[in-house]
Amino acid sequence: TVGSFQNSDFNRTYFDELYDEILKTDALIIDIRNNSGGNSSHADYLISHFIHLPIPQGTWSSPMYIAAHASWNYPREWYMQTPDPILPMDEKEIYQKPIVLLVNATTFSSAENFCVLFKGAKRGKIIGTPTGGSTGNPIFIDLGFGLGCCICTKHELDTDGNEFIGIGIQPDIVAEEDINTFLNNGDSVIEKALDFLRSK
């Protein structure tokens, strides 16, 4: 059997309820298409069930503003941090079967961070189209008249030190959603993932 799950409001309780069933599968499809993110600690928790070795996390930075420095025309200053590596889960059995991760242009924020970790761990193939290219952590600006905008506050690198902000995580296998398949209640991206897993 090939297990799959998609939950745009992922949380640990939801995953824990599924995990015993996931362990019984022969392969797993994780679908984070159209997932705008949420709490990055959930992504860290999820990946910890699929790895045997620690995964380094990418360095992130955010601009700092010190009014006096600005008045003296100092160059922009940045706060930088490299979080601790993600460790394998030590309280449960690690899932060792093949995994495919599905992504698209509306995979953002913590969902995209999960994609970064998954790719860094070399845990499986990423199938779909490039992700959105934004880590999230937005600041909201009220523009008035019922309008607003969000601006990303973090600049982040992947686990290998590569840029993905404004670029997206590139899939290993490109698969675009097909309108004809969709109209017939199918999913061409999942079909591509299944074809790949059957070939293993």
Residues of each region from the PLM?
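Low-complexity, Gly/Ser/Thr/Pro-rich intrinsically disordered linker/tail segments
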Residues: 170-200
